[in-house]
Design a protein with these regions (language model features):
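Terminal leader/tail segments of proteins
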Residues: 2-144
Length: 144
């Protein structure tokens, strides 16, 4: 089994241990134990995050100079005024807050209490949807 995981990593796929750590990290970040992470159905160096039957977004792996990192992207189809309540309801976490960024009008920050989760950028000129962009470094996964 160890060889299978090593072979999978050598091919660029994600190992089961990596998927478990990513799941734990997303659960902790969003304060929601219902988040799941599984291998992407079409991309070998990616994973899909779900909440029950609902697709949340995609996690892409990147390796540079021997350091492996990940990028989570999630589309949120609501306007700015509804953003915080939508995310709190979706994840069942009233500690999620959407905060304006200094000197930036095209994006907001998403936090879980005092912890920064990521930046949400406006997708269209009417600001009717946002995309959460969240970098996940290998050190973020060390303590999960």
């Amino acid at each position: 089994v160890a060889n299978a995981a090593t072979d999978e990593a050598a091919r660029g796929g994600m190992e089961k241990a990596e998927l478990a750590k990513l799941r734990a990290h997303l659960r902790r970040s969003f304060g929601c134990d219902l988040i799941n992470v599984q291998p992407h159905s079409r991309k070998k160096d990616a994973a899909e995050a779900t909440l029950g039957e609902v697709g949340l977004g995609e996690i892409i792996a990147d390796e540079e100079d021997g350091d492996r990192s990940f990028f989570f992207e999630m589309k949120v189809p609501v306007e700015r005024a509804e953003l915080q309540s939508f995310l709190r309801k979706r994840f069942g976490n009233d500690k999620l807050t959407v905060v304006a960024r200094m000197k930036k009008t095209d994006s907001v920050e998403l936090n879980n209490g005092p912890d920064h989760i990521g930046v949400m950028t406006v997708d269209d000129a009417q600001a009717k949807s946002f995309t959460l962009e969240m970098a996940i470094l290998d050190i973020d996964l060390d303590d999960v």
